[in-house]
């Protein structure tokens, strides 16, 4: 499919409300670096989460006179939140040609997260995905012949224009985004649920998120992505990501947990090494992040465990482990790792199946 395939019909005029719940996700093979209209420089592959979700409701009413601007109001956690308006306005400008009926309507948007907004967990993926799904549901109401397959592709396509990683928050439990020889139907335009063989051990995998720092990052992901444009190691990294995507596909089929641990942790540390080797350079890990990583390594060696970590573009740590180890790992977290978390907070989550209509 190409971009023009997603250009929507003009003249759709509907009233009503659409509500969706969309999950966050955690990349195993990392997306870092973009080009053009929110296209990834390399493929990424992620676990869709189950409990860390955004719930969004959009009420559409037809405007008496369509304007050249967008008409909307936004509330978060039940309170009007004008500080979000610039980001939503920018998103609407990016998707305008694909959903040209937006300017014919006033949108009343209400959103909330299942996790604290100030937790340090990136909510843009779940939030933008949920908003895109709500908007596309309205389009489907006006164009009921839209197929389920096309609906999911276009929802991911639109979500990508709000936040790159949001492209991976429509489906589940494992999603790839970015053209890759390893997955025939992969695309730079949208995320795709992985339909190849997945070993049973990964079907109920756990992710406990240690909230090391709940504050705002000193360097945004957008800035970090842009620093890859002239990065000394960019070409090597993009090649590595393609190779790791192919390797991870094989690991997911075989259930080789030793190989999974090695690849996932290498990807996490590579992401932060790229930040430290950028110009200008920056560090998003905190001292407590490193303390946790060393504790995880010690625990794994001592207990013959498959517990491993991954990191997003921040200080928090995602601990990944098989469901069979849940009891022992949670005990370890409470006894030895919670003290490194801000206010002792962590969130227990697991692999999920993607967005759902409410």
Where in the sequence are the language-model features?
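ATP-binding N-lobe of GHMP and related small-molecule kinases
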Residues: 1-119, 133-149, 332, 347-358
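Catalytic-loop motifs flanking and including active-site residues across diverse enzymes
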Residues: 24, 127-131, 240, 244, ...
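Short beta-strand segments
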Residues: 48, 211-213, 310-312
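Short Gly/Ser/Thr- and Asp/Glu-enriched loop/turn motifs at secondary-structure junctions
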Residues: 106, 310-315
